[in-house]
């Protein structure tokens, strides 16, 4: 029973951490432990560590940490790429060394030795494609082609010049401070890829996420079948029920079978738990980015719209406060009337109307052309189509 509760607690803690990390910043979790855990994982832990280093080693220690942070987070570097290769290689090596001796088994055939290796190779190829493909770098030679791909919405995108590159900024583009270049349909800079994710390599990035989710899921299920096969081949259930008198119910057998598996095949159990957690994380990332692709939105635009709604909310609140203050000052000189009493309520109502209006504008996405067309733009970027080249030529003429 203790093992059973330990596994339940472990699963609940893992689920809490995963949800907090992925979704803790959502408005629905505001003021909850999920938000605090998200802050601690993303900012708080590093902030406390920086303060500790400053307290122990002074400003010199802090400067060293900040210089390491600048190299790791603010400049292109292959650190996370090396970590990815190390994780991929070591996980496959440990899986092959600990589990391939049980293939073929009761549930798995010999073919899985080769399909697993092939799946890993495909994953590495997709990783390399995403790392070294052009995300859609905008320069003086091709800027007209990217400008003709998407119109300006004059809300979050308007005609302006990049202050660094000194070229016109196409709609949906952004200057990446890490790569020091403008990227068309900029989504985000991915440290794992050491590359930006933009118009021309989003399809590789999505394929990478989907394939690695399936790869980790495949590994989890395969190891599960190997362990189930060992339980069947060694007649563990029969031994427990006949020789140890354990009741045949699932509730009685499950904790003891799990305890036996953890003690006998601990490496496989650890690998299975690790792959299950990673597959859950990858499923969350893929679902998030798939939703962005289906609605023709980018991560960068999501933050831009959030800032736009927040700014409009603050402006409407400021206007309502100013109007209420003005009404209050006038009421000091005049006898309060029914009109002045409800003025504050009307002011709050108009502020709410402004918020709703800003939210409605944000939901009217100029670039959303329907799910099928949106996905086709990911697979076949607009700037690479002949129609886009013809438009840019006509504009230049």
Swiss-Prot record:
UniProt GO MF annotations: protein-cysteine S-palmitoyltransferase activity
Localization annotation: Endoplasmic reticulum membrane; Cytoplasmic vesicle membrane
Domain (DHHC): give its ranges. 160-210
A single BP term in Gene Ontology: positive regulation of response to salt stress
Q: Which UniProt keywords apply?
A: Acyltransferase, Cytoplasmic vesicle, Endoplasmic reticulum, Lipoprotein, Membrane, Palmitate, Transferase, Transmembrane, Transmembrane helix
- List the InterPro entries: Palmitoyltrfase_DHHC, PFA4/ZDH16/20/ERF2-like
Which top EC class applies here?
transferase
Q: From the record, give the cysteines joined by S-S bonds.
A: none
Enzyme Commission identifier(s)? 2.3.1.225
Pfam families, from UniProt? DHHC
Q: Does the keyword Acyltransferase apply?
A: yes
Question: How does the record say this protein sits in the membrane?
Answer: Multi-pass membrane protein
Which residues are named in the active-site annotation? 190
Q: Which reaction does it catalyse?
A: L-cysteinyl-[protein] + hexadecanoyl-CoA = S-hexadecanoyl-L-cysteinyl-[protein] + CoA
* Transmembrane spans: 2-22, 37-57, 83-103, 117-137, 207-227, 269-289
Q: Which domain of life is it from?
A: Eukaryota
Q: Name one GO cellular component term.
A: cytoplasmic vesicle membrane
* Domain remark in the UniProt entry: The DHHC domain is required for palmitoyltransferase activity.
**UniProt similarity note:** Belongs to the DHHC palmitoyltransferase family.
What's its job? Palmitoyl acyltransferase.
Q: Would you tell me the protein name for this molecule? A: Probable protein S-acyltransferase 17
Q: Give the species.
A: Arabidopsis thaliana (Mouse-ear cress)
Q: What is the lineage of its organism?
A: Eukaryota, Viridiplantae, Streptophyta, Embryophyta, Tracheophyta
Q: What gene name does this entry carry? A: PAT17
């Amino acid at each position: 029973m203790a093992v059973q509760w330990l596994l339940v607690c472990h699963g609940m803690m893992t689920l809490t951490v995963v949800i907090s990390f992925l979704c803790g910043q959502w408005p629905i979790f505001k003021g909850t432990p999920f938000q605090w855990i998200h802050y601690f994982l993303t900012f708080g832990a590093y902030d406390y560590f920086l303060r500790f280093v400053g307290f122990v080693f002074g400003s010199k220690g802090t400067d060293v940490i900040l210089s390491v942070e600048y190299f790791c987070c603010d400049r292109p570097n292959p650190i996370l790429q090396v970590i990815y290769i190390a994780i991929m290689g070591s996980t496959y090596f440990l899986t092959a060394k600990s589990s391939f001796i049980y293939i073929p088994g009761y549930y798995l055939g010999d073919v899985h030795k080769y399909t697993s290796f092939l799946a890993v190779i495909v994953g590495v190829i997709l990783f390399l494609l995403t790392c070294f493909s052009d995300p859609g770098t905008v320069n003086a030679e091709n800027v007209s082609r990217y400008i003709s791909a998407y119109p300006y919405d004059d809300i979050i995108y308007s005609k302006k010049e990049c202050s660094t590159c000194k070229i016109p900024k196409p709609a949906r583009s952004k200057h990446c401070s890490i790569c020091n270049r403008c990227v068309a349909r900029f989504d985000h800079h991915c440290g794992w890829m050491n590359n930006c994710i933009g118009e021309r390599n989003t399809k590789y990035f999505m394929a990478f996420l989907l394939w690695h989710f399936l790869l980790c899921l495949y590994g989890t299920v395969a190891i599960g079948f190997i362990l189930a096969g060992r339980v069947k081949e060694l007649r563990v259930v029969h031994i427990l029920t006949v020789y140890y008198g354990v009741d045949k119910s699932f509730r009685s057998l499950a904790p003891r079978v799990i305890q036996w598996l953890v003690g006998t095949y601990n490496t496989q159990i650890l690998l299975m738990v690790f792959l299950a957690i990673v597959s859950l994380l990858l499923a969350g990332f893929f679902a998030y980015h798939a939703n962005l692709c289906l609605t023709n939105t980018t991560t960068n635009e999501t933050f831009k719209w959030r800032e736009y709604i927040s700014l409009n909310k603050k402006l409407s609140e400021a206007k309502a406060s100013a109007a209420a203050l003005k009404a209050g000052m006038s009421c000091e000189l005049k006898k309060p009337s029914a009109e002045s009493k409800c003025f504050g309520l009307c002011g709050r109502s108009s502020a709410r109307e402004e918020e709703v209006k800003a939210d409605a504008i944000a939901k009217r996405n100029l670039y959303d052309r329907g799910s099928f067309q949106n996905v086709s733009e990911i697979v076949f970027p607009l700037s690479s189509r002949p129609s886009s080249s013809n438009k840019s030529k006509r504009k230049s003429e």
